[in-house]
Structure formats: C-alpha cells, structure tokens
C-alpha cells in the first residue's frame, strides 16, 4: 500500500475514507467527485412521492443520520465539502434549481460523464435527477440506474431501490491504495501546477527549448520525489 493525494489518483481508483469504500470519479478545481463503491441500503427517493431532491426524504437522511455516522468515522481532517447539485430535469426544466448538501445522489449528467469508471451494482439505485417537474405534470418520477448500468425512471416513493451516496472530497486528502493503482502519468492538475511554477520562475518565457526541457525535467523529478516520500510515510 502507498499513500497519495486524491488529486494524484487515477479515475476509477477505489479507496476507503470515513469507514466507507469510495470510487474516485473526477477531480475538479481542488475537489474530487466520489461515489460510494456499493449501495448502502434500500430506501425511497422520497417517502412523500416527490421527485424534487431538494426536499426529498433521501436528501434529509443522507445529510442527517448518514453523514453523522460518516463524520464519526473520520480519522484526521474532515475532507467532506459542501456543494450545490444541479437539479435540472431530464427534459431540461430548471424548476427545482439547486440545493446545498454534503452528501447527495449523482445527477444524470454526472453519471453519464463518469459511466466508464462506475461499476455496476447488484441492485437498482437512485439518481437525483427528476424525469420532469410538477409544473409539467410529473411530480413523482425520478431517475434510477439498473443493474446493467442503463437508465430508467420510477415512482419516487418506491422503497426497494438503493441509495448510492456521492460526495465531494478535498483533493489534497491522502488516501491509501495498492502500489499498482498509482498513476505514473502527470494529470492535468499536475501539468497546470508545473506550468505555473515554471512561469513564476522564468517569467513565463524561455530563452531556448533546452532551457524549457531542463526546467520541466527538474519539476517532474521533484514531483516523483514527493510521491516517493508520501509512500515511505504510509
């Protein structure tokens, strides 16, 4: 096992945090979108059959008792970040706006964007996106993911579909992974950091191509040394 920062891990990397197993879906501007590796339990999207995640009973549960349990199992700094998921419906209506949460269900867009690294589950599970809205005659249909990964919809009050929580974590969080899971490639985030450091050191210009190559090699060497140091302090 070795420790690396979440921002240095490859998409699809599985890791444990706060007593639960997560999958890294994507890194974005200092935060990492993560999905529970498994369905945690079966529960209605909303016990009142409302497909608006902003007021759904599943949202209240995930950000209440469930989040409290996660925080109790945090060993070290709390890396959970708040966010505002976009609740635009399947047909493009924006009646439901956004809501402020820490734990949430993936939107359809987040699911589609990261489908290539999301393993199928052994049961159906909810997304936070509604089929349409009450103003359009659909106040009860919410999106779900089937066991083969395909998308469907069903009544929000149905209590036999799973909750598969998602969250944003601070991308500087150190996680433990198997050695062969570590990425050897420079991620876009790393590349940006390298370019910024080079620009600061050389004023954004290089006299020759050799100068650029030398500086870049130095920065990459520093990055590798940092990773090796993290591994030694596992």
Placement of each model-derived feature along the sequence:
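An amphipathic alpha-helical micro-motif enriched in hydrophobic residues
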Residues: 194-199, 212-220
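N-terminal acidic leader/helix
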Residues: 186-203
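Collagenous Gly-X-Y triple-helix signature in extracellular proteins
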Residues: 1-191, 225
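Charged, low-complexity interaction regions
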Residues: 202-210
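Short intrinsically disordered terminal tails
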Residues: 1, 227-234
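Short, leucine/isoleucine-rich alpha-helical interaction segments at C-terminal helix-coil junctions
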Residues: 87, 219-230
């Amino acid at each position: 096992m070795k420790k690396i920062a979440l921002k240095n891990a490859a998409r699809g990397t599985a890791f444990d945090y706060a007593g639960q197993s997560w999958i890294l879906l994507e890194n974005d501007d200092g935060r990492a979108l993560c999905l529970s590796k498994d369905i945690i339990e079966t529960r209605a999207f909303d016990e009142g059959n409302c497909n608006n995640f902003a007021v759904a009973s599943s949202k209240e549960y995930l950000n209440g008792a469930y989040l409290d349990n996660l925080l109790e199992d945090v060993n070290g700094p709390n890396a959970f970040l708040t966010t505002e998921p976009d609740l635009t419906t399947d047909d493009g209506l924006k009646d439901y706006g956004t809501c402020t949460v820490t734990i949430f269900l993936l939107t359809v867009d987040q699911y589609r964007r990261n489908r290539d690294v999301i393993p199928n589950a052994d049961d159906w599970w909810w997304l936070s996106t509604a089929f349409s809205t009450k103003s359009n005659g659909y106040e009860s249909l919410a999106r779900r993911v089937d066991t083969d990964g395909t998308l469907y919809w069903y009544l929000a009050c149905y209590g036999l579909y799973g909750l598969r929580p998602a969250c944003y974590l601070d991308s500087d969080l150190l996680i433990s992974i198997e050695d062969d899971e570590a990425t050897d490639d420079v991620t876009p985030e790393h590349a940006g950091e390298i370019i910024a450091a080079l620009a600061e050191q050389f004023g954004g210009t290089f006299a020759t191509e050799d100068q650029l190559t030398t500086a870049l090699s130095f920065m990459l060497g520093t990055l590798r040394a940092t990773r090796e140091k993290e591994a030694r302090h596992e």
